[in-house]
């Protein structure tokens, strides 16, 4: 089963562009993934490919399996069947920044990679997210948006092939979210990881994604390439896929 369905609304990708995409290395490949909790099937024979440099967003109702899929890709949840193939362990940024309060910002950035990255690498990563000169500061002195910037720096400091984002902007105010969207797009363009962003926000998906997936009942129900649509045309289609009235 391929999850990238050719939906009637989606125009075909030009052959030359498709060939370039197909030559890009895979950040992750998933085949036949299944996860059960008792008798309930949360992920049902799911297939998924994400290529390096591709930004994929995953929409769906609560309980459809989005976070379970992300946790499986991150190695935090063991699937019951199927294969997950990735060149290396991915990086994950969660809704909560999960910074250690007793560690400085640079120590948080290199957590688990102290000997291979060190302070110099942390300083560079913090500068990339607009926190230059704050290496020796403490998490308690940061705003919510600044803390998520540190979490992003930690996620990208080792240049992962795959970056997993689990609603990292959901708790931020509207203006900070907009700023974070711009920062994430800039960082992804610079580092070229494959990205899977789990979100409930259709507008966030339209702003960030190269490809938007809609998950329903443990399966990928629809796939769209935003470049083939105007946001005004695609937004009501996505809302309809999610079972939301777009009036």
From Swiss-Prot:
The protein's name: Aliphatic sulfonates import ATP-binding protein SsuB 2
EC number, as in UniProt: 7.6.2.14
Topology versus the membrane: Peripheral membrane protein
Family recorded in the similarity comment: Belongs to the ABC transporter superfamily. Aliphatic sulfonates importer (TC 3.A.1.17.2) family.
Subunit structure, as described in the record: The complex is composed of two ATP-binding proteins (SsuB), two transmembrane proteins (SsuC) and a solute-binding protein (SsuA).
Cell location: Cell inner membrane
UniProt keyword annotation of Lipid biosynthesis present: no
Protein source organism: Paraburkholderia xenovorans (strain LB400)
């Amino acid at each position: 089963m391929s999850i990238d369905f050719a939906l009637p609304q989606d125009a075909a990708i030009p052959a030359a562009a498709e060939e370039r995409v197909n030559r890009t290395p895979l950040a992750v490949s998933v085949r036949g993934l299944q996860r059960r909790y008792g008798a309930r099937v949360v992920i049902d024979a799911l297939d998924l490919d994400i290529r390096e440099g591709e930004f994929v967003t995953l929409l769906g109702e609560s309980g459809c399996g989005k976070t379970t899929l992300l946790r499986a890709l991150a190695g935090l949840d063991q699937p019951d069947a199927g294969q997950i193939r990735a060149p290396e362990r991915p990086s994950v940024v969660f809704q909560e920044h999960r910074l250690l309060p007793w560690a400085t910002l640079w120590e948080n950035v290199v957590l688990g990679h102290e000997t291979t990255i060190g302070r110099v690498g942390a300083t560079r990563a913090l500068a990339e997210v607009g926190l230059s000169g704050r290496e020796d500061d403490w998490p308690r002195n940061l705003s919510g948006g600044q803390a998520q910037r540190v979490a992003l720096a930690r996620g990208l400091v080792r240049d992962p092939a795959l970056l997993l984002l689990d609603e990292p902007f959901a708790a931020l105010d509207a203006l900070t979210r907009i700023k974070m969207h711009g920062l994430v797009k800039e960082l992804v363009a610079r580092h070229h990881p494959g990205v899977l962003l789990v979100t409930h926000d259709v507008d966030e998906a339209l702003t960030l994604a190269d490809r938007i997936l809609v998950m329903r009942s443990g399966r990928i129900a629809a796939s769209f390439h935003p470049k083939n649509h105007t946001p005004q045309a695609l937004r009501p289609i996505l809302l309809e896929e999610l079972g939301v009235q777009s009036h």
